[in-house]
């Protein structure tokens, strides 16, 4: 990287602009140190590109540079966003909601955002302190705002922060707005940013919105009677040092649960996440303290939310009494099954309901929907695409749930992003229903596998940081397109999908168009035995993801679980080998 003289020259030219008096002394010192360092790796990583809106908006490591999260990048993004909002709603007194999570610099970034919006004549509803992502989405809709910003990096490591841009429906921005905002942001120079806020246009919000949101979350409840019968369900909850502590214990009590215990060490708000390596519910290590307390209290289940409380983790007991962490696919399966089965039983299905899942999420959900005559829809990764299906079908069909394999689910339509407070309340209702029927969540999972088919899903992450890494990832996708695999771990591929061209090619050579609202840099391969592999570069992190799913039709009951899991793991190892991912 350091020998690329043209790239170094370009980065130095951009970096020198950051030595102007428009930037504070600390920033100038940090940039000068990178310029003076003979090793230009840090300089290139900090300045080789501008942070772009991916599936989750802006997200990056905090520090000086165009490719870093800092108040200037946040400022220019907000100035561009403000310009776009004012152009999109000419002559209107526009309003936005601004919130943040527990991350370092989060409050400073949120106040910077609020100042810039207000300086551009836009009314700002600024949350008085940290709040869950779904509450910010809810508030945009509740207050009739034109847009919103949430300062969060979700579950990323402590070095990161981010910026999620929302539109007037409470969902993250999609085309044409995302491109329009980027165009406006790219026009902005640092001297264009109006950093001096108009305090008269900044309105603090907090407790009243919390109450409205908690009342709305109760709409996700399916069967109140089962909660009343099992109100002593023994629940352990952790907010993982984040925003869930503000809302989730209250929400659980509002549903009627009375036996709620919290992990005290993780109730401390801290952007350094001192008790975990990474505050990611996908990592088993992050659940260690919760499981320890759950064992001590003989809890029925352990649940957690990530720092911005959009995603959740669920831990239940297996027949040996050991803790079993459900993965994101299992979580979505369980929600989908329970919502459909119990709404049907209670006569709540009218025939116009639909579920949504992302294309990389397990196909078992499709089986659950099909067997129960409920429509399901596939969409791209990123919850904004689930929100898009809700928006398209609003007034025509009834949304009853949607989720993705990365531990996100939304069980009602008053919010347009993944919602861990609502999902955590609902999983506790499901656990109560299971206990009411002499079962555990684990038993329920086995029942679903027996009825709808066993599948094992593993996401393989290939990390390639920096500029060279981005080039490697691009080349991998090019190679897969030019030389697509013919088999996966010994299974013949019968269908190749390319969402860049929106073409699906069958083994007999016939090609069909894929019906999606936009193109996306995703490849999918389907085998005759039900094996599925989806390949996509991450929109928020320097990695390429391989989502693998393997079926086993021999699963008949819980006693088959270990054998089928082992066989599936062997199959996935063979798939990795065939794709040279070892």
Short names for language-model regions:
Residues 47-67, 153-156, 235, 239-251, ...:
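Conserved phosphate/anionic-ligand binding catalytic regions in large, soluble enzymes, centered on
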Residues 107-112, 137-141, 159-165, 194, ...:
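Short acidic, glycine/serine/threonine-rich loops at helix termini
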Residues 18-22, 26, 42-51, 161-288, ...:
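Gly/Ser/Thr-enriched, mixed-charge loops and adjacent short helices
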């Amino acid at each position: 990287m350091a020998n690329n003289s043209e790239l170094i020259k370009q980065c130095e030219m951009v970096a020198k602009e950051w030595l102007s008096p428009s930037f504070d002394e600390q920033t100038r010192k940090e940039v000068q140190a990178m310029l003076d360092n003979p090793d230009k790796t840090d300089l290139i990583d900090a300045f080789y590109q501008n942070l772009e809106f991916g599936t989750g908006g802006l997200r990056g490591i905090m520090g000086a540079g165009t490719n870093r999260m800092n108040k200037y990048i946040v400022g220019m993004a907000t100035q561009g966003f403000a310009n776009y909002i004012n152009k999109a709603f000419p002559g209107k007194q526009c309003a936005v909601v601004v919130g943040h999570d527990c991350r370092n610099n989060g409050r400073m970034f949120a106040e910077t955002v609020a100042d810039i919006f207000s300086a551009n004549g836009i009314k700002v509803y600024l949350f008085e302190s940290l709040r869950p992502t779904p509450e910010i989405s809810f508030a945009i809709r509740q207050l009739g705002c034109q847009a919103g910003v949430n300062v969060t990096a979700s579950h990323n490591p402590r070095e990161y922060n981010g910026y999620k841009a929302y539109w007037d429906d409470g969902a993250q921005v999609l085309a044409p707005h995302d491109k329009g905002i980027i165009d406006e942001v790219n026009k902005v120079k640092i001297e264009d940013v109006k950093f001096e806020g108009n305090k008269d246009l900044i309105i603090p919000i907090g407790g009243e919105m919390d109450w409205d949101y908690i009342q709305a979350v109760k709409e996700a409840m399916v069967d109140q009677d089962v909660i009343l019968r099992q109100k002593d369900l023994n629940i352990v909850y952790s907010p993982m040092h984040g925003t869930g502590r503000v809302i989730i214990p209250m929400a659980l009590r509002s549903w009627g649960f009375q036996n709620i215990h919290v992990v005290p060490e993780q109730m401390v708000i801290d952007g350094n996440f001192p008790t975990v390596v990474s505050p990611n519910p996908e990592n088993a290590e992050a659940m260690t303290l919760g499981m320890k307390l759950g064992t001590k209290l003989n809890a029925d289940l352990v649940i957690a939310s990530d720092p911005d409380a959009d995603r959740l983790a669920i831990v239940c007991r297996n027949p040996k009494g050991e803790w079993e962490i459900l993965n994101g696919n299992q979580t979505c399966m369980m929600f989908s099954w329970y919502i459909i089965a119990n709404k049907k039983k209670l006569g709540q299905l009218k025939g116009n309901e639909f579920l949504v899942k992302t294309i990389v999420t397990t196909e078992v959900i499709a089986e659950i929907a099909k067997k129960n005559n409920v429509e399901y829809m596939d969409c791209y990764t990123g919850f904004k695409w689930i929100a898009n299906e809700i928006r398209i079908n609003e007034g025509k069909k009834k949304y009853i749930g949607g989720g993705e394999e990365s531990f996100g689910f939304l069980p009602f339509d008053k919010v347009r992003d993944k919602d861990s407070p609502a999902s955590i309340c609902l999983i506790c209702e499901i656990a109560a229903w299971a206990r009411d029927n002499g079962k555990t969540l684990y038993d329920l999972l086995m029942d679903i596998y027996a009825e709808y088919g066993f599948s094992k899903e593993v996401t393989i992450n290939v990390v390639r940081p920096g500029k060279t890494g981005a080039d490697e990832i691009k080349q991998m996708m090019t190679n897969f397109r030019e030389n697509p695999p013919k088999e996966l771990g010994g299974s013949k591929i019968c269908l190749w999908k390319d969402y860049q061209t929106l073409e699906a090619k069958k083994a007999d050579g016939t090609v069909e168009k894929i019906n999606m609202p936009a193109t996306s840099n995703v490849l999918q391969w389907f085998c005759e035995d039900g094996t599925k592999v989806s390949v996509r570069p991450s929109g928020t992190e320097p990695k390429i993801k391989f989502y693998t799913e393997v079926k086993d039709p021999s699963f008949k009951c819980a006693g088959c679980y270990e054998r089928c899991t082992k066989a599936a793991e062997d199959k996935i190892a063979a798939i990795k080998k065939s794709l040279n991912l070892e």
